[in-house]
């Protein structure tokens, strides 16, 4: 018997029998380098090549279409923002463990302040109704002495720990505390508020206290006006619910909290508007000019 024929086919390791589907795998030998003959050979077929060529051609067509779209967008007129089609919007997913620096373009943006047409003016000027100011008299005060010796002064420590003093011109009210701090309310203008605070400080000086006039500051201004038409408050609170609250069972007015300027508006169905929270007069005017176009959009037609 021939020795070569006695070896099994897998031990010969030279070639597979004729007609076999896979090439022969050489047996491992200590003399052979590691990995020799174990690397599979790529099998190329005409079908796989045609599929790759088709995919490359489709990618080239898509890149050409995107480049032409971007060129048309850059050639647009100034002032117009080019918009991408929905199929071309970019969506980026953050890597795991990281937070995205910029919001996704598909995320809806939250408006901060209502848009105001620059060309439209209301022609209405809100009137100041009350100004609250504070001043430091710079000394400790005996409230009992002030209440007993001063005119138009009342003091009830069980009810409120301050002397309540009033003057007729300007018609205002002052709250005087034992620490020397004083709050003046009721003035109709900034000048009246300062004048009234100086008069209260002079009264305290005449009672024998070394009062000064320090750190005068206006803390709040209240204005009001009338737009002369009824307003649909239900529609306004639905459209601007992130700024407003309306509970007619608790309070008849809609409370609108404007972000810039930081003003709180009380809007009533009759068209009356109250603005509060301003530090300067210009904030009252700016807030009303911002809200007036919105109120016109919710004008009640009867």
Curated annotation (Swiss-Prot):
InterPro entries: TBP, TBP_CS, TBP_dom_sf, TBP_eukaryotic. Sequence repeats lie at residues 128-204, 218-295. GO terms for cellular component: nucleus; transcription factor TFIID complex. Pfam families: TBP. Keywords: DNA-binding, Nucleus, Repeat, Transcription. It comes from the Eukaryota. Residues 57-81, 89-101, 109-119 have a biased composition (Low complexity). GO terms for biological process: DNA-templated transcription initiation; transcription by RNA polymerase II; transcription by RNA polymerase III. One of its GO terms (molecular function) is RNA polymerase III general transcription initiation factor activity. Residues 1-20, 53-121 are annotated as: Disordered. PROSITE patterns: TFIID. It is found in: Nucleus. CDD domains: TBP_eukaryotes. The keyword Glycosyltransferase does not apply. General transcription factor that functions at the core of the DNA-binding multiprotein factor TFIID. Binding of TFIID to the TATA box is the initial transcriptional step of the pre-initiation complex (PIC), playing a role in the activation of eukaryotic genes transcribed by RNA polymerase II. Belongs to the TFIID complex together with the TBP-associated factors (TAFs). Binds DNA as monomer. HAMAP family: TATA_bind_prot_arch. Belongs to the TBP family. This is TATA-box-binding protein.
């Amino acid at each position: 018997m021939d020795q070569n024929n006695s070896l099994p086919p897998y031990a010969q390791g030279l070639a597979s029998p004729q007609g076999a589907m896979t090439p022969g795998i050489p047996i491992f030998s200590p003399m052979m380098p590691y990995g020799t003959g174990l690397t599979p050979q790529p099998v190329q077929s005409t079908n796989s090549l045609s599929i790759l060529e088709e995919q490359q051609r489709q990618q080239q067509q898509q890149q050409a279409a995107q480049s032409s779209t971007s060129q048309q967008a850059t050639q647009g007129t100034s002032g117009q923002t080019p918009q991408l089609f929905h199929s071309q919007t970019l969506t980026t997913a953050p890597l795991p463990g990281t937070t995205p620096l910029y919001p996704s373009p598909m995320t809806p943006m939250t408006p901060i302040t209502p848009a105001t047409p620059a060309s439209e003016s209301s022609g209405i000027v809100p009137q100041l109704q009350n100004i609250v100011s504070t001043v430091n008299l710079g000394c400790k005060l005996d409230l009992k002495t002030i209440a007993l010796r001063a005119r138009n002064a009342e003091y009830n420590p069980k009810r409120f720990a301050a002397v309540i003093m009033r003057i007729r011109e300007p018609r205002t009210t002052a709250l005087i505390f034992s620490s020397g701090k004083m709050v003046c309310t009721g003035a109709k203008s900034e000048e009246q508020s300062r004048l009234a605070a100086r008069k209260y400080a002079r009264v305290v000086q005449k009672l024998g206290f070394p009062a000064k006039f320090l750190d005068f500051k206006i803390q709040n201004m209240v204005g009001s006006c009338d737009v002369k038409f009824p307003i649909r408050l239900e529609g306004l609170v639905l459209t601007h619910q992130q700024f407003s609250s309306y509970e007619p069972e608790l309070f008849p007015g809609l409370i609108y909290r404007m972000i810039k300027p930081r003003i709180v508006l009380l809007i009533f169905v009759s068209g009356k508007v109250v603005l509060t929270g301003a530090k300067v007069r210009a904030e009252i005017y700016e807030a009303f000019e911002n809200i007036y176009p919105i109120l016109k959009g919710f004008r009640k037609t009867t």
